[in-house]
Amino acid sequence: MVKLNELFPKHGSRKAKRRIGLGVGSGLGRSATKGMKGQSSRSGNTKKESKEGGQMPLYRRVPKSGFSNATFAKRFDYVNIGSLEKACKAGEEVTPETMKTLGLVKCAKRVKVLANGELKKGLKVSAHGFSATAKAAIEKAGGSVTVIEKK
């Protein structure tokens, strides 16, 4: 019967690792497959992929194309009416600054109120944007909605 410690891979199925730089007699010594002198033969060699040694690099040969409106996009921080219900008292005036102090938003520059959750308290909410259902839910609970115009 074959024992586990006697198992070995079939001859020729596993290739031996090349141990370079271990003496001239090994056949892979001296320059250790790195060629002669130059940056590539030195230790710690890393050439940038963008460098092509005098040839015009690919990123400069290919023309620029396209345009993205991402830089002009209006980015909002979002607050749900469920979190306003938990954090605010009835009749309270809620502005983006108060939302920031309560920890509901990270940035008070642009805030949009969404309708996830339930609102039973009448709140006076001021924000830069409201979803239609959030606006309806706030007004149904006896609150008011003020849209802040941001340039």
Curated annotation (Swiss-Prot):
GO BP terms: translation
Keywords, alphabetical: Ribonucleoprotein, Ribosomal protein, RNA-binding, rRNA-binding
Q: Which GO terms describe its cellular component?
A: cytosolic large ribosomal subunit
HAMAP family cross-referenced by the UniProt entry: Ribosomal_uL15
Q: Name one Pfam family in it.
A: Ribosomal_L27A
Function text: Binds to the 23S rRNA.
Where composition is biased (Basic residues), the residues are 11-20
**PROSITE patterns per UniProt:** RIBOSOMAL_L15 (PS00475)
Q: Where is this region: Disordered?
A: 1-62
Which family, according to the similarity comment? Belongs to the universal ribosomal protein uL15 family.
Q: What is this protein called?
A: Large ribosomal subunit protein uL15
InterPro entries membership? Ribosomal_uL15 (IPR030878), Ribosomal_uL15/eL18 (IPR021131), Ribosomal_uL15/eL18_sf (IPR036227), Ribosomal_uL15_bac-type (IPR005749), Ribosomal_uL15_CS (IPR001196)
Name of the gene this protein is made from: rplO
Q: Which GO terms describe its molecular function?
A: rRNA binding; structural constituent of ribosome
